């Protein structure tokens, strides 16, 4: 049935309903699409827990392929009081992987909260990414200013993404695009060696010849520098939904929650908030705008009924249905 699905996905605004799938069988279907095509797949789970389960399941099915994960930046959904630096790192890694994607397609797993968050524009990310190689000359004061501009915090020792330290001719920096921090050793103004190191032991792990430092993708957003994930996706992308109607309802509710939170910030009830001078449309895409973005994509929906079966949608989209008729195995 994978070939039938791939055939239905050829039109740029394809709409396909997979009827009668159960449990995690959809992950087998998505992995089969990956193996038999060059489509990039964006799988939109219902929530963070569901997304992590899908990512782990796909990673087990496709051991040699890194399954990308786009989480939300905040520790609590739509509560802007505390960002999760590890999640910002994962978001940056996903964008970096999409920027450098080779032929064959990527698989990204996300959920509504995370998808609604705006991202730095593609050209802005490229422009603000620093590349270093051994043997290059750098000015340490310039590096210091640049890291601060990139949203990094100077500390005595580096433990988390977004931190850096300078001790003599050694610069430690935890990029928002790498699982381990980097140690840059200088001889005068020349990069003598580059290594990754363990933040727990502070001991060097692996020597490398070049590195990429990605900025805090949530820092210094203006209306002109933000975009959506769709800017990073190739034309041959398929969007997967467990329940598109539920998704539409959820993004409306969550956007209303975000508006309420922003009203508290603007009213001064939350003192000295970092987003005091920002607007909500610098951080989140409005539900109607997100739906417009999705309308231009290929979509696969699961379940026995599709939102695209109503008359209004059928005037615009041609819905194809594939029946799997799976039944639960007796326990």
Language model features with spans:
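Conserved beta-alpha structural segments and adjacent helices that either
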Residues: 1-331
């Amino acid at each position: 049935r994978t070939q039938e699905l791939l055939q239905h996905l050829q039109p740029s605004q394809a709409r396909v309903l997979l009827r009668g799938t159960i449990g995690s069988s959809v992950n087998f279907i998505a992995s089969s699409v990956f193996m038999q095509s060059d489509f990039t797949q964006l799988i939109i789970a219902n929530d963070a827990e569901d997304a992590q389960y899908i990512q782990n399941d796909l990673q087990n099915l496709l051991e040699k392929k890194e399954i990308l994960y786009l989480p939300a930046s905040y520790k609590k959904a739509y509560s802007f009081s505390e960002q999760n630096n590890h999640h910002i790192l994962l978001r940056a890694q996903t964008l970096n992987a999409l920027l450098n994607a080779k032929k064959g397609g990527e698989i990204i797993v996300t959920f509504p909260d995370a998808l609604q968050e705006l991202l730095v524009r593609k050209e802005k990310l490229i422009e603000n990414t620093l590349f270093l190689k051994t043997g290059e000359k750098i000015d340490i004061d310039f590096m210091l200013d640049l890291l601060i501009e990139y949203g990094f915090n100077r500390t005595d020792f580096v433990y988390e993404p977004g931190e850096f330290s300078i001790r003599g001719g050694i610069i430690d920096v935890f990029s928002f695009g790498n699982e381990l921090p980097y140690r840059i050793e200088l001889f005068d103004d020349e990069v003598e060696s580059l290594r990754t190191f363990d933040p727990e032991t502070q001991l060097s792990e692996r020597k490398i010849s070049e590195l990429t430092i990605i900025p805090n993708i949530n820092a210094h957003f203006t209306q002109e520098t933000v975009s959506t994930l769709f800017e990073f996706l190739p034309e041959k992308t398929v969007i997967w939904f467990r329940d598109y109607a539920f998704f539409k309802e959820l993004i409306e509710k969550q956007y209303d929650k975000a508006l309420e939170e922003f009203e508290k910030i603007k009213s001064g009830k939350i003192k000295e908030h970092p987003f005091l001078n920002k607007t909500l449309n610098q951080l989140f895409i409005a539900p109607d705008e997100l739906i417009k973005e999705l309308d231009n994509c290929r979509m696969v929906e699961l379940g026995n009924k599709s939102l695209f079966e109503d008359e209004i949608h059928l005037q615009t989209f041609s819905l194809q249905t594939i029946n799997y008729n799976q039944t639960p195995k007796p326990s």
